[in-house]
């Protein structure tokens, strides 16, 4: 699941700039939204790597802040051959923010869901006898 769409990228960076970036990456030299969609998919997977530490994925609702961060990462990926200092700095800020989300220092606005714990009284329990050999046994051999 992508956290942003091509329309989100266009709204943030303009359609003209997006077309200029996607044109050289196609065989016929025409702008192609598939290139932008691939960058958004890669950015979403990158973000999932950080979110998976605290949240159950996929998210049911994507907050606007996460949508923005996805656009920033995708824009960096689209500019991979010649990123400007501003694009690189914004990308690094996004990575720092994702690290803070992963570590629990920042709230991304996502509903905190944990994995469902099993419910019921007939749960499996495993018991075993104490170990036969241990380091405390001396003079055995």
From Swiss-Prot:
KO phenotype (gene knockout): Accumulation of unattached tails and full heads.
Cellular location(s): Host cytoplasm
Residue span of region Disordered: 102-141
This protein's UniProt keywords: Host cytoplasm, Late protein
Induction details: Expressed in the late phase of the viral replicative cycle. Expression of late genes is activated by the viral late transcription activator C.
GO CC annotations, alphabetized: host cell cytoplasm
Protein name: Gene product J
Taxon lineage: Viruses, Duplodnaviria, Heunggongvirae, Uroviricota, Caudoviricetes
